[in-house]
């Protein structure tokens, strides 16, 4: 029997460039003084996201592990999550007292989902620059994720996107499932995501 604490595992997915790594950096910096954190990043042929988070000082370098999937990023978080599960296990054993491990997927499409063996909660990140139509396109990331982040609200005027339309479509597609607009440059919306993690992840118990 493993004698280490079993941390909450939160999968963070979304298309390339939507702001997954920026979200993780912001969450880690905001939560690291309260909780014991670690991160697993996924890239196909590099460990670029691991490098970005390390150089940004999101967490101590030994708390950030990069996984090179070498193929379809969706497979590594769903059909064959063995590399990610091994990384989560190794971090849990190394530190023993982790409260939360974030698992960032490689660039996804709207149909990507995390294996329930890998993630207890899922956050899916899209961004305003993809166009106001993105929420109504649906897909598991938008309709089934535990929390949806619509990032880069500051770009709405430049790409002709209506935040009002995006909000309406998001509520129609998600029903009662929570979501938030964010601008990670200013921190707008970050507190809502943290409150969700603390509540649904029972971190404050």
Swiss-Prot record:
Q: Give compartment(s).
A: Cytoplasm
Kindly give the Pfam families that the UniProt entry links to this protein. cobW
Annotated CDD domains: UreG
One BP annotation, GO? urea catabolic process
Q: Does the keyword Metal-binding apply?
A: no
Q: Which Gene3D superfamilies match?
A: P-loop containing nucleotide triphosphate hydrolases (3.40.50.300)
Gene Ontology MF terms in the entry: GTP binding; GTPase activity; nickel cation binding
Keyword Chaperone (UniProt): yes
Q: Where does GTP bind?
A: 14-21
Keywords tagged on the record: Chaperone, Cytoplasm, GTP-binding, Nickel insertion, Nucleotide-binding
UniProt main location, coarse: cytoplasm
Q: Return the GO cellular component terms, semicolon-separated.
A: cytoplasm
- Quote the function comment for this protein: Facilitates the functional incorporation of the urease nickel metallocenter. This process requires GTP hydrolysis, probably effectuated by UreG.
Stored NCBIfam families: ureG
Q: How does it assemble?
A: Homodimer. UreD, UreF and UreG form a complex that acts as a GTP-hydrolysis-dependent molecular chaperone, activating the urease apoprotein by helping to assemble the nickel containing metallocenter of UreC. The UreE protein probably delivers the nickel.
UniProt xrefs under PANTHER family: UREASE ACCESSORY PROTEIN G
Family affiliation:
Belongs to the SIMIBI class G3E GTPase family. UreG subfamily.
UniProt xrefs under HAMAP family: UreG
Name-wise, this protein is: Urease accessory protein UreG
Q: Which gene encodes it?
A: ureG
């Amino acid at each position: 029997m493993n004698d280490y604490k079993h941390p909450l595992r939160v999968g963070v997915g979304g298309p390339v460039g939507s702001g997954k790594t920026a979200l993780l950096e912001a969450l880690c910096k905001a939560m690291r003084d309260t909780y014991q954190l670690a991160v697993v990043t996924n890239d196909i042929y590099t460990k670029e996201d691991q490098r970005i988070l390390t150089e940004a000082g999101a967490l101590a370098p030994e708390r950030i592990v990069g996984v090179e999937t070498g193929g379809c990023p969706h497979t590594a978080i769903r059909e064959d999550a063995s590399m990610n599960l091994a990384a989560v296990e190794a971090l849990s054993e190394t530190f023993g007292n982790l409260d939360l491990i974030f698992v960032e997927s490689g660039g996804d499409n709207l149909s990507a989902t995390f294996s329930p063996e890998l993630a207890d909660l899922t956050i899916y990140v899209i961004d305003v620059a993809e166009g106001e139509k993105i929420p109504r396109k649906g897909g598991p990331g938008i309709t089934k994720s535990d929390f949806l982040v619509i990032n880069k609200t500051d770009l709405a005027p430049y790409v002709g996107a209506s935040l009002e339309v995006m909000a309406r479509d998001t509520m129609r597609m998600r029903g009662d499932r929570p979501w938030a607009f964010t601008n990670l440059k200013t921190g707008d919306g970050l507190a809502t995501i943290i409150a969700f993690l603390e509540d649904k992840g029972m971190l404050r118990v």
